[in-house]
Structure formats: structure tokens, C-alpha cells
């Protein structure tokens, strides 16, 4: 389960490192999919207090097993309100358009939310005053260079971090695609190369 680290590992690792996730920092991870599950594992290993956000009550136990200290169901207004103005950093991995304001209001003054999920259509425009009044930032990040990728691989080796995968045969690729579109994949599919026609 090391191959997906070159995408699903470095994509969350780079912004977590850049924005100094670590001891004494409260870090939110929005989404518990291919990128989000790695974000939780990495932020936990970096020593941050990790809060996972999901729209699904059924993912609470999975998020905790990945290393989340807390899990918030983002559809629950009371759970969201309990975290207003408390995050140093939020990594948003969701690749579907959604209300960014629901998460920027959770940032402390000078907090940053970094987007790594790329939706096919734009997010609704954020409320500017929500950013201005507390000097909050919305940023973006995409993978990393060779030295940072090597650093991430070394970090994962040191902490025993791998991507959670489902190994499939080459002849299952169409079925895997259909399942992925439906959201029926637990984190990452990996094709067993020994099943490729030679």
C-alpha cells in the first residue's frame, strides 16, 4: 500500500508540513476519502490534535481508527458550532462543490484552510468578511516536488503509515470505476500488475 503515497500521501503531507501541523496545533481534515484518510494519519503522526469532518455518521469509528481525536458530522449544526474560531489549520480534501464558509468560520484568527480536492464545478464564493475580519486565508496545494516526496516517504516509513487500499485485478477496472463514481471505495483502488495481459 505504498504506491498511493506518491499521490494520496504527498498531497496532504505537503500542506500539513507547510502550515506547520504538529504539537499544540488543532488541525481539521474535511473528508475521509482517499486524500482525507491519509491526511488524518499524517496529521496524527505529526502530533497535531486532529478533528475529522464527515457528512456521514457511519464514518465516525473509521475516522477514529485512522487517528482522529474527534469526529464532527458537518451536517450537525451544534457539532460545527462547538468548534467555531478554534482551528489553526484545516485541510479540505472534498472534491465536490460545497459551502466553504461552514469551515472558514471554524478557523482562528490567522488560520488557513487549504483546498486539495478539485471539484468539476466551482465552490460557491466564500463570504469575504468572514475572511477579512479575522485575517483568515483560503489556499490551495497540489502534490510536492521530489525532495518533499522523499521526505514524506521517509516520514511514512518511520511512522508505519501506508494508504488503505483495495487490491483489484485488471479485469475489474470498469467495475472499480463504477464503484468509485458511486463513492463505494474504501480510500484507494490499486491494480495488481500481475493480472495485466502480457
Tell me the role of every PLM-derived stretch.
Residues 16, 40, 60, 100-103, ...:
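Generic hydrophobic/aromatic pocket-lining and core-packing "Φ" positions
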Residues 23-32, 44-102:
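Adenosine-nucleotide cofactor-binding segment
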Residues 107-109:
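Helix-to-beta-strand junctions that scaffold the AdoMet/dcAdoMet cofactor pocket
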Residues 117-135, 146-154:
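Rossmann-fold NAD(P)-binding glycine/threonine-rich loop
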